[in-house]
Amino acid sequence: MLKSQEVRKLAPEMDPLRMGMGWKEEDLTKPQILIESTYGQSHPGSAHLLNLAQKASRGAYEAGGKGALYFATDICDGMAQGHDGINYSLPSRDIIADLVEIHANATTFDGGVFLASCDKSVPALLMAIGRINIPAVFVTGGVMDAGPDLLTLEQIGKYSAMYERGEITEEQFTYYKHHACPSCGACSFMGTASTMQIMAESLGLMLPGTALMPATCEDLSVAAEEAGKTAVALAKKGMKASDIVTLKSFENAIMVHAAISGSTNTLMHLPAIAHEFGIPLDADTFDRMHRGAHYLLNIRPAGEWPAQYFYYAGGVPRIMEEIKDHLHLDVMTVTGKTLGENLEDLKKNGFYEKCDTYLNKTGLKRTDIIRSFDDPIGTNGAIAILRGNIAPDGAVVKHSAVPKEMHKALLKARPFNCEEDAIHAILTHQIQPGDAVIIRYEGPRGSGMPEMFYTTEAISSDPELSASIALLTDGRFSGASKGPAIGHISPEAAQGGPIALIEENDLIEIDIPHRILRVVGINGEKCSEEEVQRVFNERRKALAPFKSRYTHGVLKRFTQTAHSPMQGGYMD
């Protein structure tokens, strides 16, 4: 018997309450499907999800189920940038997961369709799926169109820094702002939103080929309706999310992450999702699997083209076809078939021919967007975990976005205790080539772990600094960030991590090939490892205990309980 029918016997009020919303008597006995989305007029990534949720509900009804629409509206990192709102970004992931858990368990459901588009909402719903463990199908809200001259939102940070330096006029800057987001959908670059949409499909929780579709494409509505039908089929079979998502699924997702040069935020989101499924996963797994992996995707910010072309080039299935010798093809998916079977079906049903038809209209070839395995952009993945006396527990760098001349560097420390001071120093030319800008007390326990997006844009948009300095932080970066940026430094400063002990003009060694990040000199003079440790010990005695400025609310709870970003940065 379906779980919803068992609960009906225990809660006689349930039937009349549902009929009060217009349900018919026959609806009460059908498989009950939770249609959970992050719809809201909060940003373009969620504003269109109501329509897709309704399509999913229709699909469930046509398959003999009954859908119920629930909402957990997310926030937009882009709207939170540049002020204290960004401190709520990572905590919002965990709060949304909590709300979905409440929705799913307070009223019993037999299955669910989960719809989201963006940075924190996709991992939030994936975390919730692992936690509630019901038959589940994910639908992502796709990607927005690019603007005139293929303008995309991640370029606005660059133009903002150029405007601040007087390099473009106010009229030019206004034009860029008014044309960067011409439609609904996730931002059209391979940032965290696009990456996490791809991760959802790579885990086996989406219908094949449906991640990162153009939001304006009718195919997306069809996919949402099919997801509703699939959720009913899974509910009738009793196939739970944990029957699909395994350690092998996460390893597949990490291999896809390497192939697309995905966002560094994935190194927090996938471990947090795995935690909810009861599967151990840490950042070192990314480092191991990225080594020697072929990087294939020519999409911004590291590549040339907007993300709307990803689907037209064949999407996740095309990436998987290219790297299939490095994937677990025997993993189960929501189709009830294995990954290998899904890939074979797509070849037979004309999926790739349809995609080629779309792409040919742009004058591009598939290999302009997704390179072949034998002709990759790079052959060592995209991500590395660095360690040393600055980051004993690790730090993350997206080396595919770092200029080659900065893969090994010796720099002078310029520490700042907040991002605002660092940005001011960069924009007023106080930072010089050979400096290492260090931003600390911005980790999960410090300020909620905001993104350092404007700092990276100020650096990467400056021709003199972009290949001559580095940014080190216990905070994190936007998926749009590029350049020599090392984040997630752990332990963080707020917990007494060594990053809190660095002083002006200490010498910082960065060695990405050998995975090293350490202080090798004091006050501009190189010295032994033992001498550095002796100085650190003396500085620690004078280090004042960190005192959080958050005395109530969400940020107090998050900064008191959040785990290390190396473990997923999730809140207990």
Pin down the residues of each PLM region.
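A short, small-residue-rich loop immediately preceding and capping a beta-strand
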Residues: A104-L125, A136-T140
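Catalytic or ion-coupling anion/metal-binding cores of large enzyme and transporter domains
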Residues: M1-G45, L52-T73, G78-M79, D84-S89, ...
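Well-ordered mid-protein domain cores that form the structural environment of catalytic cofactors
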Residues: S89-R93, A97
